[in-house]
């Protein structure tokens, strides 16, 4: 999968509900169903340019939402914290340290780490 597709899919998972139903539909057909602009236009009985404009508008809105709310950044940070906690768990022999590291990892993942979604 392309980097842009991964980024857009992640942003859609976070903010997709903020888009209109039509924008959600266009996004889903393009990114999740992997339809071409021509196929989307034919299916929805709109122009190819209309399909493209709707998808681009959806992408821009998702990026704007993330710029304001910064959920993807927080999620990435929580994933990094969880990964570091996992390293601590593997590298220490202290049961007490392992216990605290497990708690940190669990908290980070429950707050939206990549693996906690």
Name every feature range the model reports, one short phrase each.
Residues 3-16:
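Short, Lys/Arg-enriched N-terminal segment that forms or immediately precedes the first helix
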């Amino acid at each position: 999968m392309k980097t842009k597709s991964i980024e857009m899919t992640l942003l859609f998972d976070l903010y997709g509900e903020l888009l209109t139903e039509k924008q959600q539909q266009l996004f889903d057909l393009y990114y999740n169903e992997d339809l071409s602009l021509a196929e989307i236009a034919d299916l929805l009985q709109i122009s190819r340019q209309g399909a493209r404009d709707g998808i681009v508008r959806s992408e821009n809105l998702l990026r704007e939402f993330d710029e304001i709310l910064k959920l993807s950044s927080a999620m990435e940070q929580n994933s990094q914290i969880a990964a570091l906690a996992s390293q601590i768990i593997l590298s220490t022999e202290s049961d007490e340290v392992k216990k605290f590291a497990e708690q940190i990892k669990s908290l980070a993942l429950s707050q939206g780490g990549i693996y906690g979604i």
